[in-house]
Amino acid sequence: MFKVDLNSDLGESFGAYKMGMDEEILKFVSSVNVACGFHAGDPCVMDKTLNLAKQNGVCIGAHPSYPDLLGFGRRNMQISFEEAKNYALYQLGALFGFAKAKGMKIQHFKAHGALYNMAAIDENLALALCEAVASFDENIIFLGLSNSAMNEAAKKKGLRYANEVFADRAYNDDGTLVSRKLEGALIHDENLAIKRVIKMIKESKVTSINGKEIDLKADSICVHGDNIKALEFVKKIKENLEKEQIQICALENFI
């Protein structure tokens, strides 16, 4: 039987600002990526998010970002190896404090936004993130884009690596994600997106935006629950995976 993890970004509210439908999405996913304060989230939100994850039996991961609250972590930054490593360590430590207080463990590490996209093509940046994870806890799974520089970096640092794919995003011919700024970056046809997901899991292939068949491994599928429509889409994905006898379970069960 095929196994796959469903992950979603959570805890992205902060202060008086509420974002996402965290309570609802937790009913359908097996792992969550918790914002650690640099692009979103704050101590109270982190506390609440971990409580919700624990109540629902969902595994947690750190979701660190560039220090860019204003830009929601989606703006590229040029930072040094040491800065990248230390920013990652700082955010891991923040989440660990809450996790330890609740008797929980950090299952995985997944970079956010621009940090994720840049680390996918910049092995030096990816190595900095992997070094942070390895020095913090070598048992933490590094979750990153399938067939990317992050995968190679994780191997070099001796970390377990989980290959992530996206249900609603288009791919370039080289396996990177099409920029959100470009037309066609998001797939709005739900049935097409679900067919693509099943193909990625069962055949380890996806069709790029230019029609090229590319190889990739799907250990975890990133889904979103920002609004009612997105939530309904996640429910449909889960239902279709179960029909295909694909088992949904957290990464720690098979990576």
Swiss-Prot record:
Signal sequence annotation: none
Domain of life, source organism: Bacteria
MF annotations from Gene Ontology: 5-oxoprolinase (ATP-hydrolyzing) activity; ATP binding
InterPro entries: Glyco_hydro/deAcase_b/a-brl, LamB/YcsF/PxpA-like
Membrane-spanning parts: none
Catalytic EC class: hydrolase
Catalytic activity: 5-oxo-L-proline + ATP + 2 H2O = L-glutamate + ADP + phosphate + H(+)
Keywords: ATP-binding, Hydrolase, Nucleotide-binding
Enzyme Commission identifier(s): 3.5.2.9
Keyword match Signal: no
GO biological process: carbohydrate metabolic process
Coiled coil feature spans: none
Gene3D superfamilies hit by this protein: Glycoside hydrolase/deacetylase (3.20.20.370)
Role description: Catalyzes the cleavage of 5-oxoproline to form L-glutamate coupled to the hydrolysis of ATP to ADP and inorganic phosphate.
Family: Belongs to the LamB/PxpA family.
Quaternary data: Forms a complex composed of PxpA, PxpB and PxpC.
NCBIfam families: PRK05406.1-3, PRK05406.1-5
Protein name: 5-oxoprolinase subunit A
Organism: Campylobacter jejuni subsp. jejuni serotype O:6 (strain 81116 / NCTC 11828)
